[in-house]
């Protein structure tokens, strides 16, 4: 017989009631007496467990009844409805095959464990209730991202992980090298001679797929990239990781308004998809992680996002009478406290802030007519602050070259990016959404380390 997932049983029980089935998974709990016992089985496909009834009719009852938590078994038996019990059905086992016995010192016993402890056993934490739910949500949300863009006929582009370009111009990148670190070659100036390295130049791990995606947007129209990015920032905060995933669409013949329209629609789509397809997990998060979760998500999906300029935002903050840790004046980069005040206290819903000062934004953002601001827009949401950053890209070659000089960037490193402005340049826009940021927002999980399977942070690269 073909193995059935526990999720299938819960989603379509009428197909399987009073039929012989095969299920396989890991023991969550076991209660046995002399002649019979109850096993709570979980196979990772669903939030809820499946109750297995075992009795002395099993040839190996003595062995099965003494199995430790997390032992893996394959169960054959009949699925029987149990309308008067707390679970809707159970399996009356006719055969139990023990695949792997767990040791008694299995670290995930029934008691509650702190998230900090569970991070130390990242290889086992997906077996816990919370993290099995988190990573099923991560899978569903990733599927929703692809589904959204594919339905809109965006082309999925795989941008390179190894690059010679710094998209942000910040220089906080991980270096990729095969040079002998005990005998590093030097050039005549006494600097590292990267011409002897694997790529004949200084290569890094990407901080963004945006620049590469732009080249494909100017061929396919609408594209998106969704993959890992890396930042060598020494930030030990709950919101930062050294390796994370980014959703980055780029759209040709699109301005700032077009970007904001797509971003708003995408955020609502992902949240709705997860709410509809993982109600058990989301109920768990709303009950045990963040009791205001449903209220917050409902506010996002049912509100029209507000749009204000950076100048208007600064004016509102200055007139609020609120005493902020970081004083507000035109030209500063808005801090999380400012962003949250705008979206929570002033508007009570998501807010796009547009047209930031050019000095605090990246070189590739389109310079506005005032020569002081750029056509950028960040999406701020209640409870978090900024989750999306994007802009209309600078399509004018002369302006882009001038901006690169202001940022002291070497044009030779970006020759191909500049060439895009020579051969049929067009207005285009795009944005970046940190995938983990929206996962944190949808689950109420407050630390980015708890929505990434194996988090990479300063001083930590275990597993």
Swiss-Prot record:
Q: Does the keyword Endoplasmic reticulum apply?
A: no
What does the entry list under GO cellular component?
cytoplasm
Localization, UniProt: Cytoplasm
EC number(s) per entry: 6.1.1.22
Q: Name one GO molecular function term.
A: catalytic activity, acting on a protein
Mostly located where?
cytoplasm
Q: Name one GO biological process term.
A: asparaginyl-tRNA aminoacylation
Report which superkingdom the organism of origin falls in.
Answer: Bacteria
Alphabetized InterPro entries for the sequence? Aa-tRNA-synt_II, aa-tRNA-synth_II, aa-tRNA-synth_II/BPL/LPL, Asn-tRNA-ligase, Asp/Asn-tRNA-synth_IIb, NA-bd_OB-fold, NA-bd_OB_tRNA
Could you tell me which Gene3D superfamilies the record lists for this protein?
A: Bira Bifunctional Protein, Domain 2, Nucleic acid-binding proteins
Q: Which Pfam families match?
A: tRNA-synt_2, tRNA_anti-codon
First-tier enzyme category under EC: ligase
Q: Which UniProt keywords apply?
A: Aminoacyl-tRNA synthetase, ATP-binding, Cytoplasm, Ligase, Nucleotide-binding, Protein biosynthesis
The chemistry this enzyme catalyses reads: tRNA(Asn) + L-asparagine + ATP = L-asparaginyl-tRNA(Asn) + AMP + diphosphate + H(+)
Q: Which family does it belong to?
A: Belongs to the class-II aminoacyl-tRNA synthetase family.
Binding partners and assembly: Homodimer.
Entry protein name: Asparagine--tRNA ligase
- Give the species this sequence originates from: Clostridium tetani (strain Massachusetts / E88)
């Amino acid at each position: 017989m073909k193995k059935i997932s526990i999720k299938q049983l819960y989603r379509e029980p009428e197909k399987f009631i009073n039929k012989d089935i095969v299920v396989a998974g890991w023991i969550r709990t076991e209660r046995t007496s002399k002649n019979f016992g109850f096993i709570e089985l979980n196979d990772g496909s669903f939030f809820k467990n499946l109750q297995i009834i075992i009795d002395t009719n099993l040839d190996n009852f003595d062995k099965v009844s003494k199995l430790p938590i997390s032992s893996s078994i394959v169960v054959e038996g009949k699925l029987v409805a149990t309308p008067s019990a707390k679970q809707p059905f159970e399996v009356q086992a006719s055969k139990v095959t023990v695949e792997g016995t767990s040791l008694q010192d299995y670290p995930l016993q029934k008691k509650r464990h702190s998230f900090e402890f569970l991070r130390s056993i990242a290889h086992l934490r997906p077996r816990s209730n919370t993290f099995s739910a988190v990573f099923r949500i991560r899978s569903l949300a990733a599927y929703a991202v692809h589904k959204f863009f594919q339905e809109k006929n965006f082309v999925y582009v795989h941008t390179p992980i190894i690059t010679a370009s710094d998209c942000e111009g910040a220089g906080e990148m991980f270096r990729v090298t095969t040079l002998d670190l005990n005998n590093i070659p030097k050039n005549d100036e006494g600097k590292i001679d990267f011409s002897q390295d694997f790529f004949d130049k200084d290569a890094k791990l990407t901080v963004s797929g945006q620049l590469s995606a732009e080249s494909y947007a100017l061929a396919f129209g609408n594209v998106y990239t969704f993959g890992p990015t890396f930042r060598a920032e020494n930030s030990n905060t709950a919101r930062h990781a050294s390796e994370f995933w980014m959703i980055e669409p780029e759209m040709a013949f699109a301005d700032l308004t077009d970007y904001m329209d797509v971003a708003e629609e995408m955020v609502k789509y992902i949240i709705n998809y997860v709410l509809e397809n993982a109600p058990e997990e989301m109920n768990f998060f709303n009950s045990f992680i963040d009791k205001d979760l449903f209220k917050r998500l409902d506010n996002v999906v049912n509100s029209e996002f507000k749009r204000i300029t950076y100048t208007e935002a600064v004016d509102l903050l200055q007139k609020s009478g609120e005493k902020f840790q970081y004083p507000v004046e035109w030209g500063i980069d808005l801090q999380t406290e400012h962003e949250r005040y705008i979206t929570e206290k002033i508007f009570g819903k998501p807010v796009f802030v547009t047209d930031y000062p050019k000095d605090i934004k990246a070189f590739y953002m389109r310079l506005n007519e005032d020569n002081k601001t750029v056509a950028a827009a960040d999406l701020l949401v209640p409870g978090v602050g900024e989750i999306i950053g994007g802009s209309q890209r600078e399509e004018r070659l002369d302006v882009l070259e001038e901006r690169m000089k202001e940022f002291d960037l070497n044009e030779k490193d970006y020759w191909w990016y500049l060439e895009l402005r020579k051969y049929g340049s067009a207005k285009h826009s795009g944005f970046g959404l940190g995938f983990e940021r929206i996962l944190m927002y949808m689950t109420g999980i407050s630390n980015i380390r708890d929505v990434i399977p194996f988090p990479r942070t300063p001083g930590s690269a275990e597993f």
